[in-house]
Amino acid sequence: MARKTPIERYRNIGISAHIDAGKTTTTERILFYTGVNHKLGETHDGSATMDWMEQEQERGITITSAATTAFWRGMAGNYPEHRINIIDTPGHVDFTIEVERSMRVLDGACMVYCAVGGVQPQSETVWRQANKYGVPRLAFVNKMDRTGANFFKVYDQLKTRLRANPVPIVIPIGAEDSFTGVVDLVKMKAIIWDEASQGTKFEYGDIPAELEGTANEWREKLVEAAAESSEELMNKYLETGSLDEDDINVALRQRTIAGEIQPMLCGTAFKNKGVQRMLDAVIDYLPSPADIPPVDGQDDDGNPIKRSADDAEKFSALAFKLMSDPFVGQLTFVRVYSGVLKSGDTVYNPIKGKKERIGRLLQMHANNREEIKEVLAGDIAAVVGLKDVTTGETLCDIDSHILLERMEFPEPVISQAVEPKSKADQEKMGLALSRLAQEDPSFRVRSDEESGQTIISGMGELHLEILVDRMRREFGVEANVGKPQVAYRETIRKNCDEVEGKFVKQSGGRGQYGHVVLKLEPLPPGGGYEFVDAIKGGVVPREYIPAVDKGIQETLPAGILAGYPVVDVKATLFFGSYHDVDSNENAFKMAASMAFKEGMRRASPVLLEPMMAVEVETPEDYAGTVMGDLSSRRGMVQGMDDIVGGGKTIKAEVPLAEMFGYATNLRSLTQGRATYTMEFKHYAEAPKNVADEVIAARGK
């Protein structure tokens, strides 16, 4: 089957924003204007098409990135048909994992900002993630019809808070109630949308007289930004004092894809103005899969290899999202980087070392689906019938292996015990939890050996609350949930230069003999665990060395202070001995475990607690109270900024243990007028009095 849309006309984009910037409404309008759905969904009444999980519709927040395909021929029908794959990303901090995983497979992003609130804490998180994956982006200032809307203020914030380089492509005509349209700085014409047709019709007109001066000033900046793309254009600009429309668009496209600038637009999605021009900008300035460098990976021997976005290349794709669907079962969303995949094909998963057969292939629209026969390079689609794939894994050609760079998933910082309410729920709960953990790598499930309880861990209170809720709705499991617990860690502060572990059992016949001498050293934060084999002269035979490493690794999940996982430790095996008859792997595992535990005791073990970056936006009257409260929670206030339009943003670093129930507390302190976001920053040593309490509580 030949390609319907050339790859140059693909755009894989994400719509990303702070919680209330109006991202879902913006996405809805995109789907409406591209002719996908004919009744506009509104988030307020819970009918938005992209928010297809029940909890999202109840809470009015977007949790899962649904992927949707739409087609666009331009606002004035002046482009050949382009295919836009939209990945909807969540705007809540507990779901940064979702943002992160969608950034990994995007080619470009539209960052939506509120014209009143401007750049908010979550906007910075999302911006950092887009930087990390080098995603070209454009900015859309939404809610221009709201009281206090100010496009140019948001422009200043993008420069100061995000250190972005925004280049307005349009400027607003009016603001608040009088916002009627935009001045297109490329065409130097006014665009006024027709309200009766819900913005599907528009007309170009002359720039209003009172805006001519402002429009000329911003047009000048736009042309300068374009001219800076090459010496040739700069010379042309200097000679003629101007550039034509094609020159400007080609130059801005080059600079946007290179990450040097971010085209900036504005409108009000709710009132059907401006989104249409933003879609044109997506086509004009954001990259197609062919514009971005070939994807990097490794072959079976670990050598670097590349695959370019071409149907003729061997197949490679990344599974970036798993979902349970009530009708078809498990759906795996994949981004195809190279080659072609047909239903019925067999593919290889290099991480699991397994082959899988592809069942049906689906092209998703927010909550309905179209069955397709094949997917091509650059496509995003859903596969039915994969059994062993987890989020972040590669699928590739069975004869031409490639392992694409894996996604990084944060470690969970909060845990809760869950217990099924009845015997009937017991079996279903195990299945439900393993399915949810497969979908979401930042959610972990384990069973506590001492208490026999099932412990779930995640990125925040809301994250776990929603997963327990999904367990009830999707799997029919009723469960009781314990109090949230902090995920502490243990590490060492000093070296232990020599510690011995000896496991000897002499009984009639075959005994056990393992003897190791280790050196333990602390690693810098985030160092994890490192094992070094420094054995000389075969005092410990080669075949037992992996057993020593394994013995230590099996000891790591439960430290000696309070049974929390041990991190940031380097263990060096440098001496030992063995017995010709009695030595075996098990004996060396036991000896290593004994040595490691004793070594930790001698190396100043300490308890680490998760520290959270907290940002509170509050009216000025309550700023002192909020700061006092954060300090009383062992928080370190790191700064306070003014919010445009009044109020303060307070930044602090606070231990997670002190932040439970903070939302309720903050509401009562500020009469419900403050909001906050919180994300994991790093682990830090817990003060002695806190550590003593935690250790005592665990010892009970």
Curated annotation (Swiss-Prot):
Family stated for the protein in its record: Belongs to the TRAFAC class translation factor GTPase superfamily. Classic translation factor GTPase family. EF-G/EF-2 subfamily.
Organism expressing this protein natively: Bordetella bronchiseptica (strain ATCC BAA-588 / NCTC 13252 / RB50)
Primary role: Catalyzes the GTP-dependent ribosomal translocation step during translation elongation. During this step, the ribosome changes from the pre-translocational (PRE) to the post-translocational (POST) state as the newly formed A-site-bound peptidyl-tRNA and P-site-bound deacylated tRNA move to the P and E sites, respectively. Catalyzes the coordinated movement of the two tRNA molecules, the mRNA and conformational changes in the ribosome.
Gene3D superfamilies xref list: 3.30.230.10, 3.30.70.240, Elongation Factor G (Translational Gtpase), domain 3 (3.30.70.870), P-loop containing nucleotide triphosphate hydrolases (3.40.50.300), Translation factors (2.40.30.10)
UniProt protein name: Elongation factor G 1
A molecular-function term among this protein's GO annotations: GTP binding
Domain of life: Bacteria
GO biological process terms held by the UniProt record: ribosome disassembly
Keywords: Cytoplasm, Elongation factor, GTP-binding, Nucleotide-binding, Protein biosynthesis
Sequence positions that bind GTP: 17-24, 88-92, 142-145
Pfam families xrefs: EFG_C, EFG_III, EFG_IV, GTP_EFTU, GTP_EFTU_D2
InterPro entries the record matches: EFG_II (IPR041095), EFG_III (IPR009022), EFG_III/V (IPR035647), EFG_IV (IPR047872), EFG_V (IPR035649), EFG_V-like (IPR000640), EFTu-like_2 (IPR004161), G_TR_CS (IPR031157)
Subcellular location: Cytoplasm
Domain tr-type G: 8-290
GO cellular component, one term: cytoplasm
Predominant subcellular localization, coarse grouping: cytoplasm
